[in-house]
Amino acid sequence: MYGKIIFVLLLSEIVSISALSTTEVAMHTSTSSSVTKSYISSQTNDTHKRDTYAATPRAHEVSEISVRTVYPPEEETGERVQLAHHFSEPEITLIIFGVMAGVIGTILLISYGIRRLIKKSPSDVKPLPSPDTDVPLSSVEIENPETSDQ
């Protein structure tokens, strides 16, 4: 049962991470006029240029929170352009290993907590009955009717 719970938690985390990576949340208020997205794309001669795309909310589309999917711009050839990363390779590697260690540590911590909750403490365990069951445990002596008739 706990394995199923952990599986569902891991699956929901994967879904939420993939949802965050494909969507972007933009805050719009009535005073905001535009949301600007900048992408760095490479030209054919390997020099970089900055493309700016502005999205202006219309008066009837203004909301507190709107979720929209933002795709990278396409070049004239119709191919998508890879975005430039702000981190170097060692930093990205450390980030990935850090996230992996965090997820594995969380799973181990949850399983340790579950094991501690399932395990009974020695005070909760009832003692085994004594092998000498002939002797009654009450302090009141009961008269035996067979011996009283004599």
Curated annotation (Swiss-Prot):
It is found in: Cell membrane. Pfam families: Glycophorin_A. Changing residue 46 to E: In Ny(a) antigen. The lineage of its organism: Eukaryota, Metazoa, Chordata, Craniata, Vertebrata. Changing residue 66 to Y: In Vr antigen. Keywords: Blood group antigen, Cell membrane, Glycoprotein, Host cell receptor for virus entry, Host-virus interaction, Membrane, Phosphoprotein, Receptor, Sialic acid, Signal, Transmembrane, Transmembrane helix. GO terms for molecular function: identical protein binding; virus receptor activity. Changing residue 84 to P: In ENEP/HAG antigen. Glycans are attached at residues 21-23, 29-32, 36, 38, 41, 44-45, 52, 56, 63, 66, 69. It is a single-pass type I membrane protein. Residues 1-19 form the signal peptide. The modification Phosphothreonine is found at residue 133. This is Glycophorin-A. Homodimer. Component of the ankyrin-1 complex in the erythrocyte, composed of ANK1, RHCE, RHAG, SLC4A1, EPB42, GYPA, GYPB and AQP1. Interacts with SLC4A1; a GYPA monomer is bound at each end of the SLC4A1 dimer forming a heterotetramer. Residues 121-150 are annotated as: Disordered. Component of the ankyrin-1 complex, a multiprotein complex involved in the stability and shape of the erythrocyte membrane. Glycophorin A is the major intrinsic membrane protein of the erythrocyte. The N-terminal glycosylated segment, which lies outside the erythrocyte membrane, has MN blood group receptors. Appears to be important for the function of SLC4A1 and is required for high activity of SLC4A1. May be involved in translocation of SLC4A1 to the plasma membrane. (Microbial infection) Appears to be a receptor for Hepatitis A virus (HAV).
